[in-house]
């Protein structure tokens, strides 16, 4: 348990636990094989996305669906594809904001342009609900805002679409890639590359990280580095190593299992 706490409060997830996920893990060898093949075109990727959407809609045959909408590329793309495939489908767009002057104003305009209903959930004090949300996910997490749009979506439909995972699947963290490459040197070993990677996720830990734990948790950075070694101790290119770490890290151990726990709790 103490190791779980150490890892979660440093990486935002604990890669030592077993998770059940519909999203498969990837190994460096799989990426290497793909890189030696033919890259899919944007049209092929679009076709695959439409196929996934159609499969989900056909399986559930909903009268209405919910969509978690922000002003980001991922959820906007999802909305555009859904409306293009189903021009008459009743779509409820849901945004979560922590003040009335947030991005919800722009998200509403996007929703209206696609002829959908828009709902904004304003969370006045996110810290107030944190103990309750942590009791659901059973982990010391702070990034649990998705509960609010999942809860709201339950009022409209049992089928919810989100843009979660778009950055990990399609390389959306460009600001982090730029920083990683600026720190990267061809002679860096796996440990130095791991350090660079963590420096690009500085919002997940604090500069004096080793001081926030008591004596019961023997914190040292070497233990954290070893958890990520598999992603950087291989012959992939530097950005492919970052993609592998992002995909197998936050997507597999953070976004997917956290959302699944909320889905199960709320019956989505």
What are these regions (language model features)?
Residues 1-36, 40, 51-57, 146-147:
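N-terminal glutamine amidotransferase
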Residues 8, 133-134, 265-266:
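Short alpha-helical scaffolding segments that buttress acidic/His motifs in well-ordered protein cores
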Residues 121, 245-247, 251-268:
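Short, intrinsically disordered, charge-balanced linker/junction segments flanking boundaries
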């Amino acid at each position: 348990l103490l190791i779980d706490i150490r890892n979660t409060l440093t990486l935002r997830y604990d890669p030592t636990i077993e998770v059940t996920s519909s999203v498969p893990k990837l190994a460096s060898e799989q990426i290497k094989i793909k890189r030696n093949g033919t890259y899919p075109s944007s049209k092929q990727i679009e076709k695959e996305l439409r196929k996934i959407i159609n499969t989900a809609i056909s399986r559930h045959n909903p009268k209405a669906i919910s969509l978690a909408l922000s002003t980001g590329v991922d959820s906007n793309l999802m909305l555009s594809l859904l409306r293009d495939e189903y021009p008459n489908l009743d779509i409820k767009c849901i945004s979560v904001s922590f003040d009335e002057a947030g991005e919800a104003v722009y998200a509403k305009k996007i929703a209206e342009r696609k002829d959908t209903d828009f709902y904004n959930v304003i969370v006045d004090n996110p810290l107030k609900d944190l103990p309750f949300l942590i009791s659901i996910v059973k982990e010391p997490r702070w990034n649990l805002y998705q509960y609010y749009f999942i809860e709201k979506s339950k009022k409209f439909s049992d089928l919810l679409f989100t843009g979660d995972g778009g950055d990990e699947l399609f390389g959306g963290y460009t600001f982090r890639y730029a920083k990683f490459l600026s720190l990267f040197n061809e002679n860096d070993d796996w440990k130095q590359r791991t350090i660079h990677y963590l420096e690009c996720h500085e919002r997940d830990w604090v500069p004096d990280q080793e001081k926030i734990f008591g004596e019961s948790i023997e914190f040292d950075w070497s233990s954290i580095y070893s958890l990520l070694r598999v992603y950087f101790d291989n012959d992939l290119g530097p950005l492919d190593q970052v993609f592998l770490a992002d995909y197998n890290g936050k997507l597999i151990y953070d976004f997917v299992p956290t959302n699944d726990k909320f889905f199960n709790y709320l019956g989505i």
